[in-house]
Amino acid sequence: MTSETSVNLLDFDAEGLVAYCGSLGEKPFRAKQLQRWIHQYNAGDFDGMTDLAKSLREKLKGRASIVMPEIASDHVSADGTRKWLIDVGNGNAVETVFIPEETRGTLCVSSQAGCAVNCRFCSTGKQGFSRNLSTAEIIGQLRMAEFALRASLGRAPGPNGKAERVVTNVVMMGMGEPLLNYNAVVPAMRLMLDDNAYGLSRRRVTLSTSGVVPMMDRLGAELPVALAVSLHAPNDALRDELVPLNKKHPLRELMAACQRYLKVAPRDFITFEYCMLDGVNDTEAHARELLAVTRDVPCKFNLIPFNPFPESGLIRSKPEQIKRFAQVLIDAGVVTTVRKTRGDDIDAACGQLAGAVKDRTRLAERTGAAAKIIEVRAI
């Protein structure tokens, strides 16, 4: 039985686990063994960790725990998209979405309960900010999804060889702004990349930011993964209105940060995400302006048809207008994709990762009715 003050081992990346084992008088190799049991074999209790010394198992039982967030609901869409509602306590909930494709499986992970950035087109921002998630709550989403998906396919836990892995890509694009929860997000991403945990490459872990420039620089220095930037407007006046963070870090500053990031990034381009809003940011003139503002940043564009919600006062661009907008970008030689809507029958489509919009991320309302979820993205 663990004590009420026991540490949750899911909060530790490799370095943290080595330090913790050291505090118990154990050598670093014990931390690697422990990490494999937790993240590759999905072990939930210490007695089953048979290659650990009994003395260490007894120490762990008295001082540590492996505590996962609770699953409040689990839904599968007609197109195979799977959405979990995760109870993170005190009435708050976040959502995790798995998007299966022929050659990969992408997991969209949340980093905060609610969001303080308050983008006009994003329903998550309308519910307000509740709190940051812990490292355990972030990596717990991947651990939960990977082993639930393996179980559904009849695959046993074990080392994450390519043939066994179900989640091949992770996108930090669920609820919240990950760079405003840097100290919990980075250890979680280190575990995603660790060969003694999930073994994903840096090219297969993508962090999406609305443009927190100082933290983009820090991420580039400490853990450069693939980067997506929520752009959504081609000039400062419009972006100030759609993405209020732009008032603090305007486009010129953001583009310079993107250039710096590319010097260390695992991919040779930035993905710019652009939510298509009818009559707001979707004209061909906007597209030409977008090309001008991003001209010095190697990039691709991901155009996202807006998923309306009542509080926004916005509507989705017409399909023919999205095509015209995209064609301007394509004709300029820039790779451009239009997001395919996935999981909309379970409210897991792009723009719907939100929670009960009028009452933050309150759990009770969301377990009894369809949840409104932010951007579910497969890059």
Swiss-Prot record:
Its cofactor is [4Fe-4S] cluster. Belongs to the radical SAM superfamily. RlmN family. Residues 101-345 form the Radical SAM core domain. The active site is at residues 95, 350. S-adenosyl-L-methionine binds at residues 176-177, 208, 230-232, 307. Binds 1 [4Fe-4S] cluster. The cluster is coordinated with 3 cysteines and an exchangeable S-adenosyl-L-methionine. It comes from the Bacteria. It catalyses: adenosine(2503) in 23S rRNA + 2 reduced [2Fe-2S]-[ferredoxin] + 2 S-adenosyl-L-methionine = 2-methyladenosine(2503) in 23S rRNA + 5'-deoxyadenosine + L-methionine + 2 oxidized [2Fe-2S]-[ferredoxin] + S-adenosyl-L-homocysteine; adenosine(37) in tRNA + 2 reduced [2Fe-2S]-[ferredoxin] + 2 S-adenosyl-L-methionine = 2-methyladenosine(37) in tRNA + 5'-deoxyadenosine + L-methionine + 2 oxidized [2Fe-2S]-[ferredoxin] + S-adenosyl-L-homocysteine. InterPro entries: Aldolase_TIM, Methyltransferase_A, RlmN_N, RNA_MTrfase_RlmN, rRNA_lsu_MTrfase_RlmN/Cfr, rSAM. Reaction proceeds by a ping-pong mechanism involving intermediate methylation of a conserved cysteine residue. Keywords: 4Fe-4S, Cytoplasm, Disulfide bond, Iron, Iron-sulfur, Metal-binding, Methyltransferase, rRNA processing, S-adenosyl-L-methionine, Transferase, tRNA processing. It comes from Burkholderia ambifaria (strain MC40-6). This is Dual-specificity RNA methyltransferase RlmN. Disulfide bonds join 108-350. Its main location: cytoplasm.
